[in-house]
């Protein structure tokens, strides 16, 4: 016999699913609407760069640290980027202490790939001495509260943190500190599919009933820098192109709002 909590959870999922099939969302948003977005920068004093993003009730904190190290053999004049994402136990009853979950590793890869493939950071300017010394950029993403769409919030927080990062040249005797050389602002947009409906920024409840999710990271020129599908339900070719068009539209919108928010927070 099912527990009462399981029965309530099933009824809730059915309610949300039926609403969406009718073209409605539990919180009253349209299918193309994001939840309220709040950005704070320079929130970690000892980090070279940091940002906190609140998307609805989802909260993500990102800290950026730089240290010197040796370059990879096949890219001796380029700096190194290392991205880590932690699903803190305080963020959800589903997250437990211990080794990184597969889900966290997958999310970190999406954030990392978006930054790399878009050329967001001018990694050649992170070279100190070719073949000997480069800057290593550590991007640490901490999920503080999970109410859905962690990836989009993480992408936004990571880029905001990088855009406020100072390279600590002075402590290494390399001259004055300078801003991290940024060339691009990639934005990740996650689209959930429920029935035949596509919607942006799924909440935690919506993620529980969606059949598949597709995250599309794009650059400011509209090129796709990365794509990640989660879930077993397939997407038709028409749905894929519809999702890409929607992601590019929302990314352009969000990028403008975000740059405005960055200017205000500095």
Curated annotation (Swiss-Prot):
Keywords: Cytoplasm, Exosome
MF terms (GO), sorted A to Z: mRNA 3'-UTR AU-rich region binding
InterPro entries to which the protein is assigned, alphabetical: ExoRNase_PH_dom1, ExoRNase_PH_dom2, ExoRNase_PH_dom2_sf, Exosome_comp_Rrp42_subfam, PNPase/RNase_PH_dom_sf, Ribosomal_Su5_D2-typ_SF, Rrp42_archaea
Domain of life: Archaea
Residues spanning the membrane: none
Protein location: Cytoplasm
Disulphides: none
Function of the protein: Non-catalytic component of the exosome, which is a complex involved in RNA degradation. Contributes to the structuring of the Rrp41 active site.
Family, similarity comment: Belongs to the RNase PH family. Rrp42 subfamily.
Name of the protein in its database record: Exosome complex component Rrp42
Source taxonomy: Archaea, Methanobacteriati, Methanobacteriota, Stenosarchaea group, Methanomicrobia
Gene: rrp42
């Amino acid at each position: 016999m099912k527990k009462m909590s399981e029965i309530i959870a099933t009824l809730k999922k059915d309610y949300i699913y039926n609403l969406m099939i009718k073209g409605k969302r539990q919180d009253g948003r349209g299918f193309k609407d994001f939840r309220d977005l709040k950005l704070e920068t320079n929130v970690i004093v000892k980090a070279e760069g940091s940002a906190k993003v609140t998307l609805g009730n989802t909260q993500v904190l990102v800290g950026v640290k730089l240290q010197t190290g040796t370059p990879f053999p096949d890219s001796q004049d380029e700096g190194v980027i290392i991205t880590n994402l932690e699903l803190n136990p305080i963020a959800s009853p589903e997250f437990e202490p211990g080794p990184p979950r597969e889900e966290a590793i997958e999310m970190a890869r999406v954030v990392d790939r978006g930054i790399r493939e878009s050329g967001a950071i001018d990694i050649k300017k992170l070279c100190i001495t070719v073949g000997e010394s480069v800057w290593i950029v550590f991007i640490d993403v901490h999920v503080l509260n999970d109410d859905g769409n962690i990836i989009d919030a993480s992408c936004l927080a990571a880029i905001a943190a990088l855009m406020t990062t100072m390279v600590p040249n002075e402590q290494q005797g390399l001259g004055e500190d300078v801003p991290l050389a940024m060339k691009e602002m990639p934005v990740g947009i996650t689209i959930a599919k429920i029935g035949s409906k596509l919607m942006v920024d799924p909440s935690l409840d919506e993620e529980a009933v969606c059949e598949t999710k597709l995250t599309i990271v794009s650059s400011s020129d509209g090129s796709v820098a990365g794509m990640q599908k989660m879930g077993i339900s397939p997407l038709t070719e028409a749905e894929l192109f519809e999702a890409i068009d929607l992601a590019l539209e929302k990314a352009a919108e969000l990028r403008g709002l975000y740059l405005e928010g960055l200017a205000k927070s500095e």
